[in-house]
């Protein structure tokens, strides 16, 4: 199969990606870390039961214009806890919106339902989110890694066997020199 877009979201200046997972439990987290000044983010929240945290901040009418990281996590609603570890990592590194008394890292998050794939009692948590930050770099493993560790598609139709899916990323550099990147967990 021919790739439509080569590259990854890390081709965008200042973007690094970290992934951590529990292979036995088939769940994990993918973290997109932005440069120290943050980045403008857009989100399209879909699905019959979306699980998100702070994605409303990304709407253009809101006052927060930049995010410091984005979390994609397995574990359904439990996986939102992984964003707390990302916030701790960013706070330790001085990133966030300066509120005068402290900096508050802005970390939108979205989750996948992977509880029926591996061990439903092992979920991405703050420690796994922090670990993903520590592993952040320019290489992004695609497929069943990080948030994609237990990702599947085809679960809505009774009697069908879900198929493995995962994390994917791509980027394109436009003629004007601007690079646009994306990352998804499906």
Positions of PLM-derived features:
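Alpha/propeptide regions of enzymes that mature by internal proteolysis
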Residues: 1-186
């Amino acid at each position: 199969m021919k790739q439509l877009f080569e590259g990854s979201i890390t081709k965008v200046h200042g973007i690094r990606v970290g992934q951590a997972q529990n292979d036995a439990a088939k769940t994990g987290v993918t973290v997109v870390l932005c440069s120290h000044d943050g980045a403008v983010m857009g989100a399209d929240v879909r699905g019959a039961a979306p699980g998100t945290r702070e994605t409303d901040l990304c709407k253009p009418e809101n006052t927060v214009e930049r995010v410091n990281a984005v979390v994609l996590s397995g574990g359904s609603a439990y996986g939102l806890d992984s964003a707390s570890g990302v916030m701790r990592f960013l706070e330790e590194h001085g990133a966030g919106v300066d509120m005068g008394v402290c900096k508050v890292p802005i970390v939108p998050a979205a989750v996948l339902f992977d509880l029926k794939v591996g061990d439903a009692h092992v979920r991405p948590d703050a420690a796994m989110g922090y670990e993903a930050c520590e592993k952040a770099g320019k290489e992004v493993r695609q497929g069943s890694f990080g948030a994609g560790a237990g990702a599947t598609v085809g679960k809505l139709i009774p009697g069908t066997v879900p198929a493995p899916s995962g994390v994917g990323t791509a980027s394109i550099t436009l003629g004007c020199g601007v690079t646009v990147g994306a990352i998804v967990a499906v």
